[in-house]
Amino acid sequence: MKRDSSFWWVQGPGWLLFVYLIYAQAIPAFDYDIGVAMGTQESAQQITAVGVAFWYGFAFADLLIYIPFLALGLVAHWSGKMWGRVLLGAALGITVYWPVVCLAAVVAARDATGWNLENEMEYWMVLPLITLWGAWSLWRITR
């Protein structure tokens, strides 16, 4: 496999995202309140109990599916294995999808009773970049 700059633009941010997901999603999947204390999850006072359930659902699914797919896909992609492209492609599909879902939920919930998200701008600064990187990386590994 040719390790040109685009290879590194898949691998580098991919591993950064992996580390972020362990910290921000895997830990709260075991104890959501720890995620709130760490600042990686929103409290029920900010997003309601339904919002917490929604965010927890993402954390749990990330722990079971997304994080393992991303890690195994990146390792196999690094090794030049064909199945790595398939697994990484699945993880990148999730990478493109979940930020869009989260941003749509943030917009749809703006006027909902009990929804008091203090700093929506953080979502708008980070999530579109993750989506763009995921889409570009998906394109890169399939060409």
Where do the protein language model's features map onto the residues?
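Topology signature of small-to-medium multi-pass alpha-helical membrane proteins
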Residues: 1-143
